[in-house]
Amino acid sequence: MGDWGFLEKLLDQVQEHSTVVGKIWLTVLFIFRILILGLAGESVWGDEQSDFECNTAQPGCTNVCYDQAFPISHIRYWVLQFLFVSTPTLIYLGHVIYLSRREERLRQKEGELRALPSKDPHVERALAAIEHQMAKISVAEDGRLRIRGALMGTYVISVLCKSVLEAGFLYGQWRLYGWTMEPVFVCQRAPCPHVVDCYVSRPTEKTIFIIFMLVVGVISLVLNLLELVHLLCRCVSREIKARRDHDTRPAQGSASDPYPEQVFFYLPMGEGPSSPPCPTYNGLSSTEQNWANLTTEERLTSTRPPPFVNAAPQGGQKSSSRPNSSASKKQYV
């Protein structure tokens, strides 16, 4: 029961990271092969060598005739077929587990770097490198890995290997045994003294079992080919969508503008219906306001007494530094 539990865990892991056709193939593989071989295979082929009888008393003749009739037992041949066909799937599962562990380590390292109080350039470069590596691992919202990039390549190679192995084992079974189990096998091999007739037990039941396993093998091969077509269509549709998005992206802005469209705020440069003129101070222009200030200052100066009445200016002394009215007017103008 422990072995079945281990196989069940492997089945769950592979089904989570497979396509719809791949899940159907796994169902065919585990139900119609493992269960049939485990439950009915031993009961049908258990007496294969013990009930193989030949019409001779020569010692060793029955063994060599059985070896000639069955170079490898059917049940062992199907077990080898199951192991070889399942190996590419297990390799793909190992790649999935490796990417999952790597994604977890990258997230943990990213959290440790973001928790640091100081952000020096080395930390920023390390975070950028981690984000670049995590971008290569496509993870869905539910935590499963998407079949993209390197994982897609591994998956396609595994399906190709399964198809080749499936076709090879079907051809080998046809070359070794054919499609039916004959009730009488004619043997002529040393140390048999002459042509010997050997008899197989339950040939009709074994013929039905052989045909059933051949049909299961053909179904598995067809499913593998359908999965290859499905993956090819998926990659082509994704490439077409990416090119379409790339072509429609520059159409959002002008063709001559290489920069993305941005929003800028401009101040009104002239008067218009949407921008009323700015009101002036007291309705006067700047020149008129300067003249008004100059007149007020002269009026205040004429009414104020001079600060030094007793100090008469001498001959060589300079005059007052206040400019005359014409100079002031020029200054203010």
Curated annotation (Swiss-Prot):
Domain of life of the organism encoding this protein: Eukaryota
GO biological process, one term: cell-cell signaling
Biased composition (Low complexity): 318-333
An example molecular function term from Gene Ontology annotations: gap junction channel activity
Keywords recorded for this protein, A-Z: Cell junction, Cell membrane, Gap junction, Membrane, Transmembrane, Transmembrane helix
Extracellular side: 41-76, 172-208
Tissue specificity statement from the Swiss-Prot or TrEMBL entry: Highly expressed in lung.
Keyword Transmembrane attributed: yes
Chief site of localization: membrane
InterPro entries reported in the protein's UniProt record: Connexin (IPR000500), Connexin37 (IPR002263), Connexin_CCC (IPR019570), Connexin_CS (IPR017990), Connexin_N (IPR013092), Connexin_N_sf (IPR038359)
Pfam families: Connexin (PF00029)
Gene Ontology CC entries for this record: connexin complex; gap junction
Cell location: Cell membrane; Cell junction, Gap junction
Membrane-spanning residues: 21-40, 77-99, 149-171, 209-231
Membrane-side (Cytoplasmic) residue stretches: 1-20, 100-148, 232-333
Membrane topology: Multi-pass membrane protein
Function recorded in the entry: One gap junction consists of a cluster of closely packed pairs of transmembrane channels, the connexons, through which materials of low MW diffuse from one cell to a neighboring cell.
PANTHER family the UniProt entry points to: CONNEXIN, GAP JUNCTION ALPHA-4 PROTEIN
Subunit structure: A connexon is composed of a hexamer of connexins.
UniProt family annotation: Belongs to the connexin family. Alpha-type (group II) subfamily.
This protein's name: Gap junction alpha-4 protein
